[in-house]
């Protein structure tokens, strides 16, 4: 048997909600999680989740990692990583088969300080290169429940996006029809990304990780064009005239 035909490793992008905790009261955490899950059951059911303890540890609020992991699993969430934990928390997480995530993005690299020995050396002018984004992806067919679409640029959809479908783009998203599924724009952290839709009835909309669920979108006008964008770390939904 050709050994190369058995398996292969391929690069890919994996998305998981990040659960940032500000309170270490497990009862309150469970209550709030139940509310969140009830507001978007299709999105959160059997969803992977990475939990971030950095805010708790910065404020000297300790939490029982084993109890937290048990709580998440009981609510049908699957912990896939711990971030911001202290050494003992990370050790316990690893013992429970939850890996440690460093939380450092490609933009967070720490560069060593460089001392220039000769202060008379001429300053090197930076070379400015314009970022080139891939052409927009266009979808003309309906996006059905269970389908997932990812665009490394802008995403333009001319047909309906059904409930249970998920569309994601590193740039802007345009849906020239009804959206009933989930839409995530700026998935690589582009806070300037926007979302445009002719009829917003979504289960969830997100820009750069900031999201609103269907529960938050109840007051959004139906069958009217809207745009969604970020302002001061909050999603703004604005009707287009």
From Swiss-Prot:
Provide this UniProt record's keywords sorted from A to Z.
Cell cycle, Cell division, Septation
Q: Among the record's GO biological process terms, what is one?
A: regulation of cell division
Residue ranges that the Swiss-Prot or TrEMBL entry lists as coiled coil: none
Pfam families linked to this entry: MinC_C (PF03775), MinC_N (PF05209)
- Superkingdom classification of source: Bacteria
InterPro entries recorded for this chain?
Answer: CAP/MinC_C (IPR016098), MinC (IPR013033), MinC_C_sf (IPR036145), MinC_N (IPR007874), Septum_form_inhib_MinC_C (IPR005526)
- Its quaternary structure? Interacts with MinD and FtsZ.
State what this protein does. Answer: Cell division inhibitor that blocks the formation of polar Z ring septums. Rapidly oscillates between the poles of the cell to destabilize FtsZ filaments that have formed before they mature into polar Z rings. Prevents FtsZ polymerization.
What does the similarity note say? Belongs to the MinC family.
Q: What is this protein called?
A: Probable septum site-determining protein MinC
Q: Supply the source organism for this entry.
A: Nitrosomonas europaea (strain ATCC 19718 / CIP 103999 / KCTC 2705 / NBRC 14298)
């Amino acid at each position: 048997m050709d050994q190369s035909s058995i398996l292969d490793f391929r690069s890919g992008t994996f998305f998981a909600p990040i659960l940032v905790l500000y309170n270490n009261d497990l009862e309150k955490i469970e209550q709030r999680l139940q509310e969140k899950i009830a507001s978007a059951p299709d999105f959160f059911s059997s969803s992977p989740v990475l939990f971030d303890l950095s805010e708790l540890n910065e404020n000297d609020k300790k939490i029982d990692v084993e109890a937290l992991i048990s709580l998440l699993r009981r609510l049908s969430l699957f912990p896939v990583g711990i971030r911001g934990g202290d050494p003992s928390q990370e050790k316990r997480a690893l013992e429970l088969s939850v890996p440690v995530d460093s939380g450092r993005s490609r933009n967070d690299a720490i560069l060593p300080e460089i001392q220039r020995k000769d202060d008379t050396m001429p300053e090197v002018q930076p070379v400015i290169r314009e970022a080139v984004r891939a052409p927009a992806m266009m979808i003309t067919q309906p996006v059905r429940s269970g389908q997932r679409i990812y665009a490394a640029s802008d995403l333009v959809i001319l047909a309906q996006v059904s409930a249970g479908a998920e569309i994601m783009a590193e740039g802007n998203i345009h849906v020239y029809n009804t959206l009933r599924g989930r839409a995530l724009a700026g998935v690589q952290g582009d806070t300037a990304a926007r979302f445009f839709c002719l009829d917003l009835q979504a289960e969830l909309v997100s820009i750069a990780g900031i999201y609103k669920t269907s529960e938050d979108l109840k007051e959004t006008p139906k069958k009217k064009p809207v745009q969604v964008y970020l302002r001061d770390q909050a999603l703004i939904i604005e009707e287009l005239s």
